[in-house]
């Protein structure tokens, strides 16, 4: 337990930041999983492109705000772009 008033405040701030960081990373994980799910489900190209756009926007935002490292955001965007460019829905 913190002994000083300022240490108590820092503990509260750290808890809030931790929760915020966890929520943002969880959102990112969901967006990335959504795109992968659409690719695996052989969805229409337009649906995959919409998911790609949402994922890139989320990666850009989190990279700029330093929730994730900017290089990681760039690497993930490159991987998503490659997956989108290689994606061709097969008729079933």
Swiss-Prot record:
One of its GO terms (molecular function) is structural constituent of ribosome. The keyword rRNA-binding applies. GO terms for biological process: translation. Pfam families: Ribosomal_S20p. Keywords: Ribonucleoprotein, Ribosomal protein, RNA-binding, rRNA-binding. InterPro entries: Ribosomal_bS20 (IPR002583), Ribosomal_bS20_sf (IPR036510). Residues 1-21 have a biased composition (Basic and acidic residues). One of its GO terms (cellular component) is cytosol. It comes from the Bacteria. Residues 82-92 have a biased composition (Polar residues). Residues 1-26, 73-92 are annotated as: Disordered. Binds directly to 16S ribosomal RNA. Belongs to the bacterial ribosomal protein bS20 family. HAMAP family: Ribosomal_bS20. This is Small ribosomal subunit protein bS20. The lineage of its organism: Bacteria, Pseudomonadati, Chlorobiota, Chlorobiia, Chlorobiales.
């Amino acid at each position: 337990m913190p002994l000083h008033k300022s240490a108590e405040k820092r503990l509260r701030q750290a808890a809030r930041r931790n929760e915020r960081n966890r929520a943002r990373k969880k959102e990112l994980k969901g967006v990335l999983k959504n795109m992968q799910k659409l690719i695996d489900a052989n969805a229409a190209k337009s649906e995959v492109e919409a998911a790609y756009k949402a994922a890139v926007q989320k990666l850009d935002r989190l990279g700029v705000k330093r929730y994730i490292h900017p290089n990681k955001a760039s690497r993930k965007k490159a991987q998503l772009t490659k997956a989108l460019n290689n994606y061709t829905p097969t008729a079933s």
